[in-house]
From Swiss-Prot:
Location within or outside the cell: Plastid, Chloroplast thylakoid membrane
Protein's name in the database: Photosystem I reaction center subunit IX
A Pfam family recorded for this sequence: PSI_PsaJ
Family annotation (HAMAP family): PSI_PsaJ (MF_00522)
Lineage of source species: Eukaryota, Rhodophyta, Bangiophyceae, Bangiales, Bangiaceae
Gene Ontology, cellular component aspect: chloroplast thylakoid membrane; photosystem I
Family assignment from sequence similarity: Belongs to the PsaJ family.
Membrane topology term: Single-pass membrane protein
Organism (species): Porphyra purpurea (Red seaweed)
Record flagged with keyword Cell membrane: no
InterPro entries from the UniProt entry: PSI_PsaJ, PSI_PsaJ_sf
Main location: plastid
Length: 42
């Protein structure tokens, strides 16, 4: 069972969802502490 679970975690949709969740959280926290950084270069 452990082999199937690690194979499931290494699939592209799971890695994509985890990566997008991390990226969204990072941008949200960056925007919370530095609200003008995202719009500075526009």
């Amino acid at each position: 069972m452990n082999n199937n679970f690690t194979k499931y975690l290494s699939t592209a949709p799971v890695i994509g969802v985890l990566w997008m969740t991390f990226t969204a959280g990072f941008i949200i926290e960056l925007n919370r502490f530095f609200p003008d950084v995202l719009y500075f270069y526009l």
